[in-house]
Amino acid sequence: MACRQRGDSGRPSSWFRADWRSFFLSFTLLTSVNSIDVNQLDPAFPGTVTCYENRMVVEFKRTLGNKIQHASVVDSLGLKMLNCTYVLDPEKLTLKAPYESCTKRVLGQHQMTITFMNDNTAHRQKTVLYHVSCPVMQAGRHDQHSGSTICSKDFMSFTFHFFPGLADDTAGPKPQMGWTVTVGDGERAQNLTLQEALTQGYNLLIENQKMSIQVLFHATGVTHYSQGNSHLYMVPLKLTHVSPGQTIILSSRLICASDPVTCNATHMTLTIPEFPGKLKSVSFENKNIAVNQLHNSGIVMEIANGLRLHFSKTLLKTKFSEKCLPYQFYLSSLKLTFYTQLETVSMVIYPECVCESTVSIVSGELCTQDGFMDVEVYRHQTKPALNLDTLRVGDSSCQPTIKAPFQGLVKFHIPLNGCGTRHKFENGKVIYENEIHALWADLPPSTISRDSEFRMTVRCYYSSSNMLINTNVESLPPPVASVKPGPLALTLQTYPDNSYLQPYGDKDYPVVRYLRQPIYLEVRVLNRTDPNIKLVLDDCWATSTMDPASLPQWNIIVDGCEYNLDNHRTTFHPVGSSVAYPNHYQRFAVKTFAFVSEDPAFSHLVYFHCSALICDQLSSNFPLCSASCLVSSRSRRATGATEEEKMIVSLPGPILLLSDGSSFRDAVDSKGHGTSGYAAFKTMVAVVALAGVVATLSLISYLRKKRITVLNH
């Protein structure tokens, strides 16, 4: 037998703190006491026993004095146990012994025999044997979360398991009446009778050899930690039951995080506020992961301003749910173990991602101001993962604006009037919807069907409040003009200056312009009095022939905006109130630098063309008609109408562009009209041509007469 005067501190092992830490039994034993000399039976064991997971601790009464130095562990016959290694501490009056080598099992108990010399007899020393016991916990009694706080929506709960005998003692007609509840630590500890505890947020249930206690988050003694929108609750709890001959003490520290997890397309995030505790491990799906292994296991931990755990969705399970399309992500349970207040405590939560609905995933509350909805699709947004190469939107005419294969991400910029986007009016909102399709990444090609396809409805809306205008009306507005049937007609004209008062007539072409002289152009809708329509330019360009499709071409306006690759940009001019329907007009000035070559004698005829469309400001495409040139050309191009909806209009005649060194400069007046010199030039050309024709006819007549004369001779 080995006996050491100093040994380990007697703290329960880590396994016990995880699963048994909440239970110890402290009682005065009045069980069988055997003596070698029957006349020397001791009526009671002079001490108490505390039972741990793999050992017991005996605490002797101080009345024993120096006799404790002679205490030892023996077998039931009083013989030394050679394999028993125990620790005797005379100063603390304790003896610690492991169950495995120092006890034997008797009727479901770990039984140990202690002896020490009793020298109260003046004649001879006699040895007294004491049997002390701790219960044997039956295998399989605990579930995987035994010893952990179970978190629910409004309360936390903890379960203490009994052993045979203790359960019988507490199973009387009023088993709960002997219990008292102590909550809090140190000076803040409060002792409550069971009846008081029931009225202050606690509930106790004893059945089937176990005791369950439920604690509301606002119960007496509960400490509340909060940070932002995250909350954590913790309470030290001790239950004491006193009966003749024994005292039962059950203790635990309950801890619970009450907030639901948040989810995005790739991760599930759990947030816990700052509190005096440190995370030790994370357990789920029969895996226990230490903190230093979290990152390698797909879990990212942030510890600044509280604790945040980001779980990759590849770790989560999926299940069919009426709330989600097509699956809901969740963990069947998640156990977090912390070290706090010199204790190891655990809590169990049941996290799952919250979904919007079975038919829609809302891409954003409001559609963008320039008439789009922006959608992000991640490869791991579903399980199994998506094949991003098979993604398509609506009628498949839309292509992704961004593809990031390494991030498993695709972004769409879907126009509200294209790609098959639909709209409807509902509760004062204009709701736009489209559908995204994709195939699963690991789907065998031979099993393609409708069920194998991922479908996600995306939507955004404009509310009626977005269209409100505050006005002060002093008179009734004029009646809305009736809609005029028939095709729309446009015209493109040029003006002498930016007053736009009198355009050039058809007889004034070609209109002459020199270097540094702007060309003032106007596109307008003809023969319409509907104030609700708006003219929107698409493209304007110049060609060297009358054919709008001929090459080369010079861009003037692209997607309704000045051409940003031209150093001499087009200037838009506002349409004032001098016209009845300003929205029926578009005015702009073109710089001649874009067309004139470096040859000082350069002259050229240039033809101007524009494509445009008509917008109905009362219909659902109004946001598109108000798009700003701050949007990139590529984005604006996606909002444009089809080629069938656009109309192309050209100037009635060409513009004659001349450089400063041209010999015709003096022949042009300040208004740009050709003068008599230029008219004489044109007349001279006609006369020369006529003279040539006459000379040709005369030659033919002479040759014919000469031939006739020769034949007559």
From Swiss-Prot:
UniProt remark on domains: The ZP domain is involved in the polymerization of the ZP proteins to form the zona pellucida.
Disulfide bonds: C51-C134, C84-C102, C367-C460, C398-C419, C540-C610, C561-C629, C615-C625
Signal peptide start and end residues: 1-35
Molecular-function annotations in GO: acrosin binding; structural constituent of egg coat
Site (Cleavage): A167, D168, S635, R636
Family: Belongs to the ZP domain family. ZPA subfamily.
Propeptide feature ranges: 636-713
Transmembrane parts of this sequence: 683-703
Organism of this sequence: Bos taurus (Bovine)
Gene Ontology CC entries for this record: collagen-containing extracellular matrix; egg coat; endoplasmic reticulum; extracellular region; multivesicular body; plasma membrane
Stretches assigned to the ZP domain: 366-632
Topology, Cytoplasmic side: 704-713
Keyword DNA-binding recorded: no
Record note on modification: Proteolytically cleaved before the transmembrane segment to yield the secreted ectodomain incorporated in the zona pellucida. Additional proteolytically cleavage of the N-terminal peptide of 30 kDa occurs in one-cell and two-cell embryos. Proteolytically cleaved in the N-terminal part probably by the metalloendopeptidase ASTL exocytosed from cortical granules after fertilization, yielding a N-terminal peptide of about 30 kDa which remains covalently attached to the C-terminal peptide via disulfide bond(s). This cleavage may play an important role in the post-fertilization block to polyspermy.
Protein name (Swiss-Prot/TrEMBL): Zona pellucida sperm-binding protein 2
Listed GO biological process terms: binding of sperm to zona pellucida; prevention of polyspermy
Function (record text): Component of the zona pellucida, an extracellular matrix surrounding oocytes which mediates sperm binding, induction of the acrosome reaction and prevents post-fertilization polyspermy. The zona pellucida is composed of 3 to 4 glycoproteins, ZP1, ZP2, ZP3, and ZP4. ZP2 may act as a secondary sperm receptor.
InterPro entries given in the database record: Zona_Pellucida_Domain_gp, ZP-C, ZP-C_dom, ZP-N, ZP_chr, ZP_dom, ZP_dom_CS
Glycosylation: residue positions: N83, N191, T457, N527
Annotated membrane topology: Single-pass type I membrane protein
Region (Disordered): 464-486
